[in-house]
């Protein structure tokens, strides 16, 4: 008695996978890093930890898990960051520029966003308003899923001119890409707000606290 064999070829073979692995740029973007040397240092350190990250199909990326923890023991330094409406020095200040740059690129790559939080202010380093992504310890994370059929790889680095580059490589099977943009509908000028302080004598001319930055508001679409 003989049993006929029915051979079924897999849709995705090893040879096909290797031939198509990371062959396409799914999204890419660069931003310029300003500020003191500690900020550049933190961004460079985070970019090195992010660089080379590979996500298999269906896997979810966590920015905090990849570049954290945001501590001195982990290698980060104190630099400017936003806290409660103020610009103050805190450990790992500057890393939100990398998370924002990465978010911008994932939108271009048409990847599925799982978690993203906006800043209180427009930081000014993103070319498109609304493409920022703030992160902090275990409270705020930036996460996205590889919703493609192939693995994807992240390349990130800070060049000698303090320009931050992020590129996502994968296999483009759909030809669908995003190009984020914004349109400023209206501008709301900032207003000075004076707060009483017991240590300042009554009648003294008010001074602006240097720890507070003034920003115009934008309504964008």
PLM region descriptions:
Residues 1-221:
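Well-ordered beta-sheet/strand-loop patches within structured domains
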